[in-house]
């Protein structure tokens, strides 16, 4: 079993218009590479996909949760019917807070609805809770030694082994694609102090149950409640973030917080107002067809008319490859679908690097109005990048690589015409 590596986010304080927003933390994630029967995302380029070939930046071996295509094997599939096993657990020193089904209801059906909207109906997420009461662990929570940043060994292995022993008489683990462990929120510290929520994905060294390893398992602990009164609407969002790791997506925040991507992807910020995934991630997960992606790989001028990412159908993404491991993605973001906090719609431009580890900044959003302070004061939304999208008449320039991306105009239907020049 390879040494566990973890990605930790520091607290980030964000101002609210009416009240002080409390410090927020995101979850950690761990990937333990190994063989698995299924992989997520689009398949490798076929001959008929030749025009897209240069834009399929390659998955980089040895990189945790590489942004490359196709997604490495070992993760849960991200299209079609996905069965999610949910087990609500408590401990002798932390008995269940409320009923177990009330804990389940904190996340569902909201999580399933979030994936339905984000995937344009391509992911059918089916949450199941075959055990409707609290699943009591045989040891106190303190005995497992779980803290933020804890490796899989020995604490989580021991916890998973106890979960399997306790649940196996009533659960057929082989029937499920992923596992969510919904811990009673009074086990461990408040999320305002430190977030324990974590995902172990691609971990074929995990304990087996009913002939399968619990290789893609998310753990959710205390409630991500910032005191703004929005928990009932937004508190569930930690689970789509954690399940994003199960599908092979990396953490986009860094040790400095969400300053590289902001609120433009739930893998960057999962506190506060609802937000969606980047178009690159939707292509990676198989939620966009190849026909919805344009590839500006050749020298010269390329023009694309892009429809809002929130809308089903139509051209969604233009990509400008810089190397076999990096390039610029171009998409249209509006306040619709899962994107609740968009205060300045427009064309979002960001750099994707497949040779950068999760939590080290594999994606960087280009800010059209640097040091502006942004256009939002919503709690737990990275303000500076909230006005990052480019508007008609504005141009992004990368002189070192000879790239100019200009937003030409927006039509009455909200489609944006984008011109990309390569020299």
List where the protein language model places each region.
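Zn2+-dependent metallopeptidase catalytic core
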Residues: 34-35, 41-231, 240, 395-396, ...
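Sequence contexts marking disulfide-bonded cysteines in secreted/extracellular proteins
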Residues: 52-60, 294-296, 374-376
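N-terminal beta-strand/alpha-helix entry module and adjacent surface
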Residues: 21, 54, 234
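Short, polar loop/linker segments at the starts of domains and inter-domain junctions
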Residues: 97-109, 277, 342-344, 363-366
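Extracellular hydrolytic enzyme modules, especially secreted metalloproteases
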Residues: 173, 178-180, 186-341
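Intrinsically disordered, low-complexity acidic/polar segments
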Residues: 95-96, 190, 276, 339, ...
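Non-catalytic C-terminal accessory/binding modules of secreted extracellular proteins
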Residues: 3, 57, 65, 208-223, ...
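Secretory targeting and sorting signals
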Residues: 2-36
């Amino acid at each position: 079993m390879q040494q566990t590596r973890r990605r930790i986010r520091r607290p980030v304080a964000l101002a609210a218009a009416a009240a002080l927003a409390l410090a927020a933390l995101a979850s950690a994630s761990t990937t333990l590479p190994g063989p698995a029967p299924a992989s997520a995302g689009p398949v490798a380029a076929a001959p008929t996909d030749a025009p897209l070939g240069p834009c399929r930046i390659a998955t980089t071996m040895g990189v945790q949760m590489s942004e490359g295509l196709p997604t490495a094997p070992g993760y849960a599939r991200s299209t079609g019917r996905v069965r999610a096993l949910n087990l609500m657990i408590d401990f002798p020193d932390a008995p269940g807070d409320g009923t177990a089904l009330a804990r389940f209801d904190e996340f569902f059906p909201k999580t399933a609805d979030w994936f339905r909207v984000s995937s344009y109906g391509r992911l059918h997420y089916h949450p199941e809770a075959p055990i409707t009461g609290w699943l009591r662990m045989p040891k106190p929570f303190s005995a497992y030694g779980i803290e933020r940043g804890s490796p899989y060994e020995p604490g989580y292995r021991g916890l998973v082994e106890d979960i399997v022993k306790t649940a196996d008489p009533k659960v057929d683990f082989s029937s499920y694609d992923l596992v969510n462990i919904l811990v009673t929120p009074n086990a461990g510290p408040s999320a305002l102090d430190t977030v324990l929520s974590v995902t172990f994905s691609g971990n074929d060294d995990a304990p087996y149950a009913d002939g399968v390893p619990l290789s893609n398992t998310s753990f959710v602990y205390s409630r991500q409640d910032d005191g703004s009164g929005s928990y009932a609407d937004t508190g569930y969002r930690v689970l789509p973030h954690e399940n994003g790791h199960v599908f092979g997506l990396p953490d986009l925040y860094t040790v400095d917080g969400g300053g590289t991507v902001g609120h433009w992807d739930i893998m960057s910020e999962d506190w506060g107002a609802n937000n969606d995934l980047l178009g690159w991630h939707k292509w990676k997960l198989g939620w966009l067809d190849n026909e919805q992606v344009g590839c500006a790989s050749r020298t010269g001028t390329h023009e694309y008319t892009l429809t809002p990412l929130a809308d089903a159908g139509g051209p969604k993404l233009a990509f400008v490859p810089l190397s076999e491991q990096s390039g610029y993605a171009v998409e249209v973001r509006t306040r619709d679908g899962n994107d609740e906090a968009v205060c300045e719609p427009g064309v979002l431009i960001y750099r994707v690097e497949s040779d950068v580890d999760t939590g080290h900044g594999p994606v960087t959003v280009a800010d059209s109005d640097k040091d502006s302070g942004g256009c939002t004061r919503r709690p737990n939304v990275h303000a500076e990048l909230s006005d990052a999208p480019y508007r008609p008449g504005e141009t992004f320039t990368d002189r070192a690589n000879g790239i100019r991306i200009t937003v030409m105009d927006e039509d009455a239907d909200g489609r944006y015409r984008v011109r990309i020049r390569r020299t």
